[in-house]
Amino acid sequence: MRASSFLIVVVFLIAGTLVLEAAVTGVPVKGQDTVKGRVPFNGQDPVKGQVSVKGQDKVKAQEPVKGPVSTKPGSCPIILIRCAMLNPPNRCLKDTDCPGIKKCCEGSCGMACFVPQ
């Protein structure tokens, strides 16, 4: 083995040892600093740099937004005849798709708007 080859092997061993030590001790690699910018003062939100309002919970979730009621009163009529289609077309998907008091019910061939019983 020539001296230059031996020197290259030694350099790689030293570099590998240094990388291994940095990984074990948790030393951050240059350019990967965990904290950038100013350190927030007491009571300041570290994310946006704003002071939190007293009595306001940062983590509390908001109530879900309630939309219009999707079901109308009444029950769907009983349908005695069924079509032979495998996937019949639907004229509606929910009660709000139907005008007035009509409900979206299973018809003889797909969903359709019916006057409830």
Swiss-Prot record:
Neutrophil and pancreatic elastase-specific inhibitor of skin. It may prevent elastase-mediated tissue proteolysis. Has been shown to inhibit the alpha-4-beta-2/CHRNA2-CHRNB2 nicotinic acetylcholine receptor and to produce a weak inhibition on Kv11.1/KCNH2/ERG1 and on the transient receptor potential cation channel subfamily V member 1 (TRPV1). This is Elafin. It comes from the Eukaryota. CDD domains: WAP. Its main location: secreted. Consists of two domains: the transglutaminase substrate domain (cementoin moiety) and the elastase inhibitor domain. The transglutaminase substrate domain serves as an anchor to localize elafin covalently to specific sites on extracellular matrix proteins. The gene is PI3. It comes from Homo sapiens (Human). Disulfide bonds join C76-C105, C83-C109, C92-C104, C98-C113. Residues 23-60 form a propeptide. One of its GO terms (molecular function) is structural constituent of skin epidermis. InterPro entries: Elafin-like_sf, SVP_I, Trappin_transglut-bd_rpt, WAP_dom, WAP_four-disulfide_core. GO terms for biological process: antibacterial humoral response; copulation; innate immune response; peptide cross-linking. Residues 69-117 form the WAP domain. Residues 29-72 are annotated as: 2 X tandem repeats of SVP-1 like motif. Keywords: Disulfide bond, Protease inhibitor, Repeat, Secreted, Serine protease inhibitor, Signal. It holds the Pfam family Cementoin. Residues 1-22 form the signal peptide.
